[in-house]
Design a protein with these regions (language model features):
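Flexible loop/hinge segments that line or gate small-molecule binding clefts
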Residues: 96-135, 143-146, 153, 159, ...
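Bacterial signal peptide processing site
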Residues: 15-19
């Protein structure tokens, strides 16, 4: 028996003493690269990726630029993970054209890519997991038309050129306005930029163009297509004493924005489901790596939220996702 045990020990040592699959490092390593890391939206994306990694038994590496307009940093992250030979990449492209070649190069190198959140000017990827952003823009436009009774002046504070997701939200909104001749589009050429601070400055500049001699506004409605532009405009309206005096519709949510919806400073918010989006992005990648067929497009849903429905359990979960459960 002793000789048999010794022989078995030597055999295991020669094979590296391979532990059970769940006893060591995960055999699937997925890089999740967001557009940025500062907004609440991206924290929810991070939480969803962590949730998937824990439930599926894979390793997730979270790495992305601090600012959403840092395309070069995001490209460098993609190239770095390709060099490291990760099992797959889940990417939210900051620019629909600038990230096209890095994604193609990754796919050609045998590193599959799942796109989340924002589209790519290419079909050279495994799957696209995202909100129907055009529909979200239309929901905002339809709400604006109803609130203004089909008549009034509206401004759009755009986000940033090259961001496919927000460009679709803007397009959906503008298409609804074009279908309603009683609504006048007073401005659609101002860009907020990638941060809440640049959005605040852009919002102040935009509001200054439409101030009345009495200190009010000569427009009736404002639409902003993402978290930073929405929060920047909210701050500018608050600082001008005009919050709640114009129909403000935003996209996405932070704690400050939810409170502003509760007190009437936002009329409505269009919400995505970022936690589930990232969860499904990682899950789709794992399924692909394991040889399963995955759909080319997965719609993660979009919801218009007002004070009338914000207390519904599912809506409340979208407004305040349990990020801390997965990140702390």
């Amino acid at each position: 028996m002793k000789a048999h045990a010794l022989a078995l020990f030597i055999l295991l040592a020669a094979c590296g003493g391979s532990p059970p699959p769940d006893a060591g490092k995960a055999d699937i390593v997925i890089a999740v690269i967001p557009k940025g890391t500062s907004h609440t939206f991206w924290k929810a994306i991070h939480a969803g990726a962590v949730k998937a990694s824990q439930e599926l038994g894979v390793e997730v590496i979270w790495k992305g630029p601090a600012r959403e307009d840092d395309r070069d940093a995001q490209i460098a992250e993609v190239e770095n993970f390709v060099s490291r030979g990760v099992s797959g990449i889940v990417l939210a492209p900051s620019d629909d054209k600038a990230l096209r070649l890095p994604v193609t190069d990754a796919m050609r190198a045998g590193i599959p890519v799942v796109i989340i959140d924002s589209g790519l000017d290419s079909k050279d990827y495994v799957s696209f997991v995202a909100t129907d952003n055009y529909k979200g823009g239309r929901l905002a436009g339809e709400r604006m038309v109803v609130k203004l009774g089909g008549k009034g002046k509206v401004v759009l504070l755009r986000y940033m050129e090259g961001s496919a997701s927000t460009m679709e939200r803007e397009r959906g909104f503008l298409d609804v306005l074009a279908e309603n001749p009683g609504i006048e589009l007073a401005s659609a050429n101002q860009y907020a930029g990638a941060t809440a601070e640049t959005a605040y400055q852009a919002s102040e500049n935009l509001l200054a163009r439409f101030k009345s001699p009495e200190g009010g506004l000569t427009v009736d409605g404002i639409y902003c297509p993402n978290e930073s532009s929405s929060f920047g405009m909210l701050r500018a309206l608050q600082d001008s004493g005009l919050a709640g005096k114009v129909t403000l519709i935003g996209f996405d949510a932070s704690e400050q924005m939810v409170r502003a919806l509760e007190n009437g400073e936002f009329d409505a918010l269009v919400l995505q489901d970022p936690l589930n989006m990232a969860y499904l992005g990682v899950k789709t990648m794992v399924s692909h790596i394991r040889g399963e067929e995955v759909p080319p497009i997965i719609d993660t849903g979009v919801t218009l939220v007002t004070r009338d429905n914000m207390s519904d359990p599912r809506v409340a979960e979208l407004l305040r996702p349990d990020i801390d459960k997965w990140l702390n």
